[in-house]
């Protein structure tokens, strides 16, 4: 496991989407008045496939759904608490329910999960999103722990035609996954370190904390639960039985 390269998952994901937009004219990017350096390049080079709907997360979902229903691959980007809680009715009706009738590939990107924006106060805290989004039928919930995993997910998100919620921390994180690690998104988890009697199961940024604990305690296993819905429950239970 490598902990050398420091990057934000947001920047790596957006840069990867930017590169895919050059190859695939069917990819669209929408945001709710929320910026990032990579967005400037997308707006300048692919302005006909970039749309800032303003501070209107509900409309962000509506427009994204419409584009996806016509066959587009859509990435909708906003702060995690706002894209989930403020637009929850639209997500439930237009994405979760409608996608069971017709394939809809809308990828909601929520930056600032958990207490990433702790200094911005409770309006920007996002502690409920996992529970809310896992309730929805036919909805994938992806919670990567490092930028390498977020990067690997891009092509998978293009190919899998269903609504998804991608949540990640806003802060810079170290690299956990290497090219040698064989990650299966269908399984939904990866045993980063094998232990004997104790195993820590974590997701997202907290996987870094779990790794730090294992270094202090010693013989502790670590499972990174990067896919919160769906995941291979049987395989997870079989893995945990060893502890």
Go through each PLM region and give its residues.
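Conserved beta-strand elements of the Class I
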Residues: 28, 199-201, 221
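Active-site proximal loops enriched in glycine and acidic residues that flank catalytic Cys/His/Asp
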Residues: 31, 202-204, 224-227
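Conserved strand-to-helix beginnings and helix N-cap segments that scaffold or border functional pockets
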Residues: 88-89, 127, 210-211, 233-234
